[in-house]
Amino acid sequence: MKSSEIRQKFLQFFQSKGHTIVPSSSLVPANDPTLLFTNSGMVQFKDVFTGKEARAYKRATSSQRSVRAGGKHNDLENVGYTARHHTFFEMLGNFSFGDYFKREAIQYAWELLTQVYRLPAEKLWVTVYQEDDEAYDIWAKEVGVPAERIIRIGDNKGARYASDNFWQMADTGPCGPCSEIFYDHGPEIWGGPPGSLEEDGDRYIEIWNLVFMQFERDAAGNMERLPKPCVDTGMGLERIAAVLQHVHSNYEIDLFQKLIAAAARETGVKDLADNSLKVIADHIRACAFLIVDGIIPSNEGRGYVLRRIVRRALRHGYKLGQTKPFFHRLVPDLVAEMGEAYPELAQVAERVAQVLRQEEKRFGETLEHGMKILDGALAKVAKGDPLDGTTLFTLYDTYGFPVDLTADICRERGVEVDMAGFEAAMQRQREQARAAGKFKMAEGLSYEGAETRFEGYESLELSGVKVTALYVEGTQVEQVSAGQDAVVVLDATPFYAESGGQVGDTGLLEAGGVRFAVADTLKIQPGVFGHHGTLEAGALKVGDTLLARVDAVRRARTVRNHSATHLMHKALREVLGAHVQQRGSLVDPDKTRFDFAHDAPMTAEQIARVEAIVNAEVLANQATEAKVMAYDDAVKGGAMALFGEKYGDTVRVLDIGFSRELCGGTHVRRTGDIGLFKVVSEGGVAAGVRRIEAITGDNALAWVQDQNVLLQRAAGVLRAPAHELPERIAQVQEQLKALEKELEQARTKLAASAGNDLAATATVEVKGIKVLAASIGDVDPKALRGMVDNLKDRLKPAVVLLAAGSADGKISLVGGVTADLTGRIKAGDLVGFVAGQVGGKGGGRPDMAMGGGTDLAALPAAVASVQKWVDERL
C-alpha cells in the first residue's frame, strides 16, 4: 500500500465516522510562542482542548505536517543514522472535543488497523497506564486483545504521573493517561516488548498513541476530572507505512525510496544505502515545507533552523563529492510525491527551488574553505580531546557552519566538541536574541473578567463604558491617581487594539473631572483590550463609567494606509507574481510598511505599475464590504489568508476594490477615501524579503507637493521647463565631462612645461646620476605621476622625487627611478624616506612609488634631503 493511499484511507475512515477533515495547519504555530514549530497534530487544536476556542465540529481528523528540529523537540542530529528519526514527518490523527472518549477511540483504532489496513491482530500489542482499568478492560474484554499482549506502564520517570503512558500539555492544565499500540516485527528482529529491558530494540515499534484527556491538573498537583473529556491521537505516517510495506526502516518506504533515488541521481552516488542520501531525502521535505509556510533562511529564530537543515544537507552532498548546487533540483521530485496531498507545495514549488538555490550559492562560497579550516583543526586535536569552542565559533561566525553541523562532522570522526567554550563566545548573541524575543510589557497581565466588546468598526465614540480592571506597572489595582501611567480595561470600547500590523488607537477616556489620555491600545490577553496611557486629571476606579473617544484624525489616516495595503498586496501579486506573500507589515497614521516575499529589487516600471493599479482602484471609489463567515467558505470564495495569522472557524472577510482578504482591522468606507497612493521607498530587508513603504491621503499629497517644489527649483537653476529637465541634466553632464577632459589636458601640458623647467633648473648630478627633487605647489597626483614619468625618460639614468602640497594641507609624493638603477635604488624606499619626514607613509614598485603626508612645514627639508640619501646609496 502506497504512502498516499495510507494517508487517504486514514482520513476517509474517520470521515465515515463523523469526523471533519481539517487541513494541515502551518508549520509555524499560530499565536503560540512556546513552540518553534508545529510538531504534532494537536497543536492547531490546542485552544480547543483548553476551552479557549470553539469549533463548529466536535470530531476532527487530519494529516498534519510536522517538524522536529531545534528547541525542545529536536531530532536533527539523529536523522540519517537511525531508522525512524526525521526532521519532517506527517502525523495522522483523530480528535474528539468532548464528544466520544476511550471506548470509541480504541474501537476506531482497532477497526482501522485490522479491517482497513488488514494488519494481523496477533501482531499488535498495547500499553495502558498502570491505573487506567477502564482502558485495560476495553482492550481486553471488548476488543479481545489477550492479556499477555496488554502491558500496564506505571510512573516510570521518577514522579507521580510521570510516565510514558501519562500525557500532560504542561505542568498544569488538561492531562490524562494514554494507550499506545505497538507492532511486532517478529523474532528475527532484536528487541523486547514495551516496559522490558530490551524495549529499545526494533522488534516492537510504536505506531499509534491514543491520549485520553480526562483530568485538569492544578498548581498543587491535584487532579480534577474534566466535565467533557477529550481524545487526541497521533500515528506517524512514515512508521505505519513501514509496517504496511513490510520494511524495518522508514527510509525504505516508497516515498523515501524515490527521494533517495533522486538524491543519488543529483550526487552521482551508486550506493542507495548511504546514510548521507537518507539525510538529504529527509531534509528536502523539511526545507521545502518550511519555505512553503513562509520561512526564509536567516540568522535567527525559525529562519536559522531552516538554514541549519539546508546546510546540513549540503554538507552531506559535499561529503558525497557533490560540490555544485544540487539540493534545489530535488523539489520537482518532492512535488511528484507530495504535491497532490499538499497542493500548497505545488503552487509555490518554483519559489521553494529559488530560495534553496540562493542558500546553496551562499553557503557554497564558504563551505570548501570552512571544511579546510575544520579539517586542519581536527588534525591538531589530540586523541580524547574535544574540538575547542573558539574554532566552533569561528566556523559558525565566519563560515556559516551551524554548530550542530560541525558537531555532526566531529561525531563522524570520533571527536567531541567544546560546547561550553562555544556558548561563552555566543553569550552576547544569545542575550540579544532573548531580549528580542520578549513580550511587550502589557501582554499576559492577569485578568479574569469578560472579554472587551469592540465597537470601533461603526463608531469612534462610545458612552457608558465600564472600567473592569486597572493596572499600574503590571500590578492590578483598584484605583489610579492623577499623574500615574496605567492600563485600563473596559467592558466595551471603540479603540482598536494593535493587531495584524495595524497600530492601536489613541484618544481620551473621560467622565466629569476624570481625563485619561490613551497613548496606545494593546490586547493584554486574547479578546481583552488594554488602554495604555496617563491619568491627567481626577481619580479613576474599577467600576467607573466613562466616555471613550478615539482620535478621529489619527484613525482616519491609519485606515487609509491599511486599506491601501490590501490593494497594494493584490497589485504586487499581479505585477510580480503569485509567489508574493506578506512577511510582515506596519500600518500607522504616517505610512504603510509592507514586507513581502520576492527575490529581486523592483524596477521603477514595476513600482509605477503597482501605483497605477492601486490608484485606479482608488479612483473607482468602490464601497468596501466586510462579511463574517465560516473560514472554509471564505477561503473557497477566494479570500486570502495571511502568513502567520491565526484564524478561527468564523472570520471577517474584507472586500475592498479587487482585493479580498481575511482581516479584523479597520478600513475606509469607500476606496476613494484613500485619496492618493504613493510608494516612497523599496528595498531589501533580508534574503528573499523586500520592503515597500507607501503613503496615502494628505501625506501623499504633501509628499507630491514637496517633490514639485524641488522640481521647480531644479528647473530654475538649470533654466529649463520641468518636462525638459532629464535632457537638460544630460546636456550639463556631457558639458561637465568635456570640461573635465579639457582641464586634464591643460594640467598635462602645464605639468610638461613645469617638468621642462625643472629639468633645466633643479637637476643635480650625483656620481654620474641625475637627481631631481622638488616641491611644485598644488598639482593633481595623477599629473604629478605623469611628470615623473616624463622626467625619467628625459634625464635617464635618473632619480626623481616630486612633491605637491594642496590647499587643505595634504602632501602628495611621487618618486621614480630609471630601470638601470633599480638594483641599487628603489623608488619605494625613496618615497618612504621622504614621507616619514612629513608625517606620512609611502611605497610602491622599484621604479615608481607614491606616498603622502600632512606636515607642510617639514616638506622643504625633506625634499632637500633626497640628494644626500641618493649619494649614500650609490
UniProtKB/Swiss-Prot annotation:
GO biological process: alanyl-tRNA aminoacylation; negative regulation of DNA-templated transcription
Cofactors (names): Zn(2+)
EC number: 6.1.1.7
MF-aspect GO terms: alanine-tRNA ligase activity; aminoacyl-tRNA deacylase activity; ATP binding; tRNA binding; zinc ion binding
GO cellular component: cytosol
Pfam families attached to this UniProt entry: DHHA1, tRNA-synt_2c, tRNA_SAD
Disulfide bonds: none
Keywords attached to this entry: Aminoacyl-tRNA synthetase, ATP-binding, Cytoplasm, Ligase, Metal-binding, Nucleotide-binding, Protein biosynthesis, RNA-binding, tRNA-binding, Zinc
Reaction catalysed by this enzyme: tRNA(Ala) + L-alanine + ATP = L-alanyl-tRNA(Ala) + AMP + diphosphate
PROSITE patterns assigned to the protein according to its UniProt record, in alphabetical order: AA_TRNA_LIGASE_II_ALA (PS50860)
Enzymatic class: ligase
SMART domains membership: tRNA_SAD (SM00863)
Binding site for Zn(2+): 562, 566, 663, 667
Localization per record: Cytoplasm
PANTHER family attached to this UniProt entry: ALANINE--TRNA LIGASE, CYTOPLASMIC, ALANYL-TRNA SYNTHETASE
Known function: Catalyzes the attachment of alanine to tRNA(Ala) in a two-step reaction: alanine is first activated by ATP to form Ala-AMP and then transferred to the acceptor end of tRNA(Ala). Also edits incorrectly charged Ser-tRNA(Ala) and Gly-tRNA(Ala) via its editing domain.
NCBIfam families according to UniProt: alaS
Entry domain remark: Consists of three domains; the N-terminal catalytic domain, the editing domain and the C-terminal C-Ala domain. The editing domain removes incorrectly charged amino acids, while the C-Ala domain, along with tRNA(Ala), serves as a bridge to cooperatively bring together the editing and aminoacylation centers thus stimulating deacylation of misacylated tRNAs.
Protein name (database record): Alanine--tRNA ligase
Lineage: Bacteria, Pseudomonadati, Pseudomonadota, Betaproteobacteria, Burkholderiales
